[in-house]
Amino acid sequence: MAERRFAAMRRLAGALALAGMIFDSPQALALTARDASAVVGLIEALQPEFGQFAYDEEIAADWYERDAADKGLIGTAGFTADSWKVALGETMRGFLATMPVAELDAIFAKLRNAISGMRELTEAQKTETIDAIDEEVEGLMILRTEGDPFADVVRPLTPKIRSLILGPVMGQ
């Protein structure tokens, strides 16, 4: 009987410890204005050296590793590899959530039209490329929905993010 009670208490302690780790982890923390602003400043500072920024988790990890091996700006700003990935992801999701769907649709329509007009591609290549874009759009719309909780924090930074990420792409 005591052995069962001890085992149950051990499981409970393990569950509480796990819950503590989960809720104490960067993923459980809400995006702060300070972190979002730091992320945008770091993109601006690192983009000339690392190239045009386009968000995904691999790029987030790559930028962290490259910066850690060089200037260490991300770490100096207070981010670990994990907290950088989380803050960057939440900032980008929040940015997407601030963008009207009509604007995103217009951006991708322009891209599809440009591909359709490329004479150097065969019709099959055009179709394949446009299909790949459509898959990316679906993924972006999911990220946009996931960004709703972060939109208010990111909204003041939207013009800056737009110029950093969309400006070069849209010829601005």
Describe the role of every protein-language-model region.
Residues 2-13:
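Bacterial N-terminal signal peptides that target proteins for export
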Residues 20-27:
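C-terminal segment of classical bacterial N-terminal signal peptides
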Residues 28-72, 148-172:
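Immediate post-signal-peptide N-terminus of mature secreted/exported proteins
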Residues 62-138, 146:
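Mature extracellular/secreted ectodomains of secretory-pathway proteins
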